[in-house]
Amino acid sequence: MKVCNLSSGSDGNATYIEGTHAKILVDAGLSCKELERRLALLNVAPEEIDAILITHEHTDHIKGLDVFVNRYRPLVFVHKDGLNALRKKLKKPLVISTFDDEPFLIEDLKILPIPVPHDVDRCTGYVISENEKKDKYFHRFGVHY
């Protein structure tokens, strides 16, 4: 599994994660243009992104979401308890998939959602692992453990 922090902090949060069969982003807190530029530095075309996992609805986590999704059509996932807050922040309507607290798969990546305290209705951290490999990555809005 390959993990690359594209940006972390109040100016924007986005992390690229690549498994054998899946390429995802955790958050899209940069402009679409900046997401494209930073993905290009990794030799990743934006249309290769399969999905975007959203931690929560603050602008520094979703700034480029509308434009990126309308342009490249990745799936978008957010915890069911954060859906309404996310929809209120978006400029354009998007198709958004929800999940609960159970693990789910995006291709070969196993996603384990974990509630994280923050000043929002629902903030979700993710433990991401590739199949049954031992490599795991925990993402909590810009802080990696």
Model-identified regions with their sequence ranges:
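A structural micro-motif
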Residues: 1, 22, 74, 93-94, ...
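Conserved beta-strand hairpin/beta-sheet module of binuclear metal-dependent hydrolase folds
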Residues: 1-42, 124-140
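Structured catalytic core of nucleotide-sugar glycosyltransferases
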Residues: 4-6, 11-14, 56-61, 87, ...
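Active-site metal-binding loops of divalent metal-dependent hydrolases
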Residues: 7-8, 28-30, 57, 81, ...
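Residues that form or flank phosphate/diphosphate-binding pockets in enzymes
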Residues: 12, 34, 60-63, 120-123, ...
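Redox-cofactor binding/interface segments in oxidoreductases and associated redox assembly factors
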Residues: 26, 54, 112-114
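Active-site metal-binding motif and surrounding structural segment of the metallo-beta-lactamase
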Residues: 32-78
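Metallo-beta-lactamase
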Residues: 78-133
